[in-house]
Amino acid sequence: MSKLALDRKLAALEALRSSDDRAASRDQLRKALNDRNNYVVSRAAAIAADMRRDELLPDVLAAFDRFFVDPVKTDPQCLAKNALASALRDLGHRGAEAFSRGIVHVQLEPTWGGRADSAGTLRGICALALADCPLDPLEILTYLADGLADPDKLVRINSAIAISQLGRPEGVLLLRLKLLSGDGEPDVLGQCFTSLLGLAPTGGVSFVSRFLRSTDEEVRLEAASALAQCRDPRAVEALAEFWQEPLLSLDVRRAIVIGLGASPLPEAANFLLTCVSHEPPELAETAIASLATSRFQAESRPRLAAAVHARANAHLKSIFDQKFSPATPT
């Protein structure tokens, strides 16, 4: 297919978004889903999902199956399968067979000096989708346990998210083991901390707090950020104790302050007000900004104004006036 022909086909597909003729747009999307070009199919799948055309689910599923045949040739970079898997999930498909096929798919494609797997995104999409399928939860957790050890970072992150979404207590054990085993990517550990705290806040706070003592600065930062977003007041207590560490870096302290700004807990707002009163100006400034976007913005304003006034710091006064001006939405 020439570039001009491809561009025309893609433009025609995009035009379907504003079409008032549902029958005609359905037929054109169905035809595009059956196209040999994987990019055309990927766009058709995305448009079908965006338009909530769930009557096309059988066509999306058939296209998904088709691109597993000679996949390196028919679907380089998994463009079609990625979009089709996302469309299946977004359109409400809950059949586990498609997603269990996708979560184990590895597609090695030629690269400079060897071959590389292009199916990481697909496995990550299917990990999230499986959590919503009416499959035995232990079978789902088996897939997700493998996902936590996947070579692709996105798959590991999405597997941790899916474990939390599944909501099974057995998932706590997988997350604890993963955290104790470690991961070279701090983002993965951060998601595991967050998922664990969501599943088991009672025991999770004490477990995640252990990692505040890690010798790895990035691990400490991820653990602190996850605790700051936790809805258990004991997490704020753990962070307050951790805050007393004399060698705690400015980056970790700033991450705690920013994270607490998103907390729904009044204890978090009190902590931030204390920071404004007693911490160095750079941290006090961050605490003011965090309070300005928190759910406690309005009720904390009088105490915050008093704390800023007591500091007698022109820069902090300027930040407060900027963040808490009358035009600032509450």
Region spans (language model):
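Short secondary-structure junction/hinge motifs that connect adjacent elements
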Residues: D27-N34, A45-I47
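Short, charge-rich amphipathic alpha-helical segments embedded
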Residues: R36-N37, M51-D59, A63
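Intrinsically disordered, low-complexity coil segments
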Residues: R295-R303
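Structural detector for internal amphipathic alpha-helices that build alpha-solenoid repeat scaffolds
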Residues: M1-D21, Y39-D54, K73-H93, G113-D136, ...
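Core helices of alpha-solenoid repeat scaffolds
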Residues: R22-R26, L57, A96, S100, ...
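Short, highly charge-biased, low-complexity peptide segments
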Residues: I256, L304-A306
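Alpha-solenoid HEAT/Armadillo-like helical repeat scaffolds in large eukaryotic proteins
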Residues: Q28-A32, D59-V72, A98-R115, Y143-P151, ...
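Short glycine/proline-enriched turn or capping motifs at secondary-structure junctions
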Residues: R301, V308-S318
